């Protein structure tokens, strides 16, 4: 029944999704204003969703242009559907323009198709279809739309300062059948205190190093500028050997006596950096083989001591595992060095329940202080957990099982979704076991089958929660 109903809306749903995907809704603080707190792109995407809601007869409510909601239904309790319309940077290597959606016979290709514009449109259409069926609502629905999920969550922080907290809700921003637990998440910077003067003349000077754009992405590109005072040919040959030994792609060029080295890696979501290839850490690994200036030497040796090939906090002394939530993970997402300003590592740490986070951070801070580094801690989000046997979770999972026949149990993840804003919130789709997970990667896409099936599941789940209940 539900899938047949969704198929009636397929063409319109894809057109609405294409419109949302065409908006380059990347956070841009350089263009932030009071009317666009995280930049014009996210604001445009937020307005786009409001306009869809108004077109379809829903009321909308804006919260300082950084978040808002589309309202449906009636009743005392509220079901929250927590979506986001901001996206991570596209990165390099796409086969098409990431913000000019390509629709094939089977799929839609663009940045945000999986994370989280495709699922947002699927959930929206589930509510739209039920509303146009003129069902007898027993609950209100707030489709809550954020614009800063990929960075600092300023959107939901602001929203829930003044707006009603849903009694229960889900975020369509992960996998089916349901995610009932999420690791704690924080970001922190490891900042080199000061530039150290050299007592001896170094053979090589690291002038500049850049890698990564987001703490929650594995960097797929790194670039270093090195002043080479002798043996330029040997350094280039050693670099080529390093690339070959590590099965990496990269380039070396010389510009006015400056050697420019680049490495390409593989970008993946920072919740499991072991699945990617961190271009920045590999390039630092090579630079450690050179007799660099003192500050640069200290910086690259820090990588070797604490970061390189240590995805689970082993070298930081933070290794920890639970059967329910898994391992601590550490993603080194943003790396920079400047000869005049020294260096900085930006890290995304995710940890399960039971990990003594504050103790671990305090110990590590003391340890690296002795090496000339400070730890600057950012926002901390504690682990989130809802019992998988809760009736709400069971209702969602039953909708999934009815539509798919798959009896997979709910599970926990290292990712963080808006679901953790709610006491009783879970992540619910929109990826399936056979979906190719290209979140935060090039050539991100959603299949038409996935879009239709996810919308059908949301239809049944929302009907069970807000009409039958």
Swiss-Prot record:
Pfam families: Peptidase_M20. GO terms for biological process: L-arginine biosynthetic process; proteolysis. Binds 2 Zn(2+) ions per subunit. Its cofactor is Zn(2+). The keyword Chloroplast does not apply. Gene3D superfamilies: 3.30.70.360, Zn peptidases. One of its GO terms (molecular function) is dipeptidase activity. It comes from the Bacteria. The keyword Hydrolase applies. The active site is at residues 86, 149. Keywords: Dipeptidase, Hydrolase, Metal-binding, Metalloprotease, Protease, Zinc. Its EC number is 3.4.13.-. Zn(2+) 2 binds at residues 84, 115, 173. Zn(2+) 1 binds at residues 115, 150, 440. Belongs to the peptidase M20A family. This is Putative dipeptidase SERP1310.
